[in-house]
Every structure is written in C-alpha cells, then in structure tokens.
C-alpha cells in the first residue's frame, strides 16, 4: 500500500481516475459531498473504487457531524460535537456521544467506507476552523466526551483518528485559507491542548492522528504536519504513539509554506507522516505521484473497517431507529439554541 490518499471528481470514476487508483503510491481515497447523490450511488462508487485499485485502499470521509458532514440526505443529521455537553446533563451527554459515534460509524461502514476522520480533539471554540466541532472548552469534559464517541465508533467496527495534534483550538485563522500561527509557549500547549491526546494515546484509544497545519512559532518554524519535532520527537518518542499519522490536506493554504505539492508531500513524509492527503487539486496529486520515490505505508492497513452488515440491516435495527430519532431531536435543539444566541 502506498502513502498517498487522494480524491475523485464526481459520482462515478472516469478513465484517468481508474489509472490513478492503480498507481503503486496510491493507498487511500477520501470522499466529498460532490461524490454523493444518494446512498445507492455512493455504495456503487465505493464498489468501483475497490474494483479499480490493485489492492484494498483505505476509503475515508469527513463525517464528523455539525457543519462537517459530507453525506446528508439519506443519512442521519449528526449534531455538532459541542451540542452534547452544551445542552445535556453529563450522563445524558455521554450516552448521546457514544450513540452518535456508533451511528456515524455504522452508517459509513454500511457503505464500505473504512474511516471517518474523527473525533476532533481540539479544545475550545475560538478557532474559525474548529468552533462547534470541539467537544468542549474544558479539557477534562472534552476528554470524557471523546472517550464516549470513540467507544461508539469502535463498537461499530471503525478505527479512530484524533485531530488536530497538538491542538488547533487556540488560533482564530482557518488553515484551509491561510497558515495559522499559534504564538503560545510549548509549555502552554502541553498544559492545555496536548493532555487529551496524551491520555487517549495512553488508553490506546487512538488508531490514527492527524496533525494541524498550524505553525507553533515558539516551537518550530514549520507547520506541525511537517515538523519532525512534533511528529517524531513528541508524538512518537515522548507519547509513544504507534498508530497511523495522516497529514491534513496538502492542498490547504496552511501547507503551502512547505513548497510545491511534491515538496509538501516529501516534507510531510520526512517529518513522520505515514499517509499524506492531496485533495481538490488533480494536478497537485499527479505531481506527488510522479515525484515521490517508491515506498510502502504498511501501518495504514490497520485502519480497514471490521463491520459486516448492509445498510438495510442497519436501518431495520431498533438501535439505529432509536438513535437516529434521539440525534435528530438533539440536532433540532442545537439549531434552536444557536438561533436564540444569534449564531
């Protein structure tokens, strides 16, 4: 399996995409809203992807909930992660978070999708890129909510991806549009943002981690996604993380500081990433495939899903029906809450 995860343009594969999926460096594919029309079409697209690739790819999506949910019509509308603790007593919030993790993962696995890049482990709501995607501004509450969500994901058969290490919650800039800079000291980042990652790693609750396209100016001039300090020294050696490290999308403006697409890809791999994402730029993805040396990304094969059920079996189950109703109710309460607050 190769170390490159890329995307496709539409709701079915074209000839060039079939060729790209055969490339030995291709190891994964991420789906977006543009790849979705309805559940039957999505399942057929994933079947085409599986058939076109020379080995089993890791098929991924961002189906977190709230504003980051690529597939909407035909799937349960998941509330933003902030909604669990913001609107419910702690015990009920924990139950809902676990059920949401289970339902999200189950709905994706029924489509033969391996992973959703979740959960978000960033602390606080101040970042434009994160906001309500964060479980809470209190690290202890965020940790407990994340534990519950992870428990649900794993119960369904999906591996977990914690993001965005070492923490994206304190910067207001959006790394999709620019390169955010976090000017806090390393000691402050370690005290406030990193403990949730550290604890979940110690509990072996994270199968993968995605670092932030953020420059922590007091620590390293490179974004964390291209920093051997953050990925090798801190994450691998100090925290003992043995799972998969993904780069975030190298097409994002936050990664542009690392050079051309090929240079960004090589920098992320040299820094310690196992798999690099190159999305929304076909020319950039082809440049990466054409210029990287041959290599394998063996760790990534650990991320295949373990579910064995159809969509019909899932939606016929009493658990899905009850959970879908509960989450839909919470989503309605959350939208009303935001409207009342003028958000």
UniProtKB/Swiss-Prot annotation:
The top EC class, named as a word, is hydrolase
Q: In which pathway does it act?
A: Cell wall biogenesis; peptidoglycan recycling
Q: Which family does it belong to?
A: Belongs to the glycosyl hydrolase 3 family. NagZ subfamily.
Q: Enumerate the residues binding substrate.
A: 62, 70, 133, 163-164
Biological process annotations from GO: carbohydrate metabolic process; cell division; cell wall organization; peptidoglycan biosynthetic process; peptidoglycan turnover; regulation of cell shape
Gene symbol? nagZ
Q: What is its main location?
A: cytoplasm
* HAMAP family hit by this protein: NagZ
A Pfam family (short name) is: Glyco_hydro_3
Reaction it catalyzes? Hydrolysis of terminal non-reducing N-acetyl-D-hexosamine residues in N-acetyl-beta-D-hexosaminides
**Which residue pairs form cystines in this protein?**
none
What's its job? Plays a role in peptidoglycan recycling by cleaving the terminal beta-1,4-linked N-acetylglucosamine (GlcNAc) from peptide-linked peptidoglycan fragments, giving rise to free GlcNAc, anhydro-N-acetylmuramic acid and anhydro-N-acetylmuramic acid-linked peptides.
Q: Which InterPro entries match?
A: Beta_hexosaminidase_bac, Glyco_hydro_3_AS, Glyco_hydro_3_N, Glyco_hydro_3_N_sf, Glycoside_hydrolase_SF, NagZ_Beta-hexosaminidase
Tell me if Hydrolase is a UniProt keyword of this record: yes
List the active-site residues. 176 (proton donor/acceptor), 248 (nucleophile)
**EC number per UniProt:** 3.2.1.52
Q: Where is the composition biased (Basic and acidic residues)?
A: 174-187
Which UniProt keyword terms apply here? Answer: Cell cycle, Cell division, Cell shape, Cell wall biogenesis/degradation, Cytoplasm, Glycosidase, Hydrolase, Peptidoglycan synthesis
Q: What is this protein called?
A: Beta-hexosaminidase
């Amino acid at each position: 399996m190769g170390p490159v995860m890329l995307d496709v343009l539409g709701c079915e594969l074209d000839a060039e995409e079939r060729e790209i999926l055969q490339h030995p460096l291709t190891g994964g594919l991420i789906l977006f809203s543009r790849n979705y029309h309805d559940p039957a079409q999505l399942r057929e697209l994933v079947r085409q992807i599986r058939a076109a690739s020379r080995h089993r790819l890791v098929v991924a999506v961002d189906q977190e909930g709230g504003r980051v949910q690529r597939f909407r019509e035909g799937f349960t509308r998941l509330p933003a992660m902030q909604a669990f603790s913001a609107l419910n007593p702690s015990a009920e919030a924990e139950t809902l978070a676990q059920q949401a993790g289970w339902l999200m993962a189950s709905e994706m696995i029924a489509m033969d999708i391996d992973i959703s890049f979740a959960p978000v482990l960033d602390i606080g709501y101040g970042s434009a890129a994160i906001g309500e995607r964060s479980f809470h501004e209190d690290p202890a509450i965020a940790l407990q909510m994340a534990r519950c969500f992870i428990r649900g994901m794993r119960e369904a058969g999906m591996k977990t991806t914690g993001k965005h290490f070492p923490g994206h919650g304190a910067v207001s800039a959006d790394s999709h549009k620019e390169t955010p800079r976090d000017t806090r000291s390393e000691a402050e980042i370690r005290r406030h943002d990193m403990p949730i990652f550290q604890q979940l790693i110690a509990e072996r609750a994270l199968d993968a981690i995605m670092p932030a396209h953020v420059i922590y100016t007091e620590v390293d001039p490179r974004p964390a996604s291209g920093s051997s300090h953050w990925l090798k020294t801190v994450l691998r050696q100090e925290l003992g993380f043995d799972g998969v490290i993904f780069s975030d999308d190298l097409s994002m403006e936050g990664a542009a500081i690392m050079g051309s697409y090929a240079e960004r890809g090589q920098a992320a791999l040299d820094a310690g990433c196992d798999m690099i994402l190159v999305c929304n730029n076909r020319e950039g993805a082809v440049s990466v495939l054409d210029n990287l040396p041959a290599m394998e990304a063996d760790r990534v094969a650990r991320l295949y899903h373990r579910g064995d059920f159809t969509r019909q079996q899932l939606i016929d189950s009493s658990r899905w029906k009850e959970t879908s109703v509960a989450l839909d109710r919470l989503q309605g309460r959350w939208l009303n809450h935001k409207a009342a607050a003028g958000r």
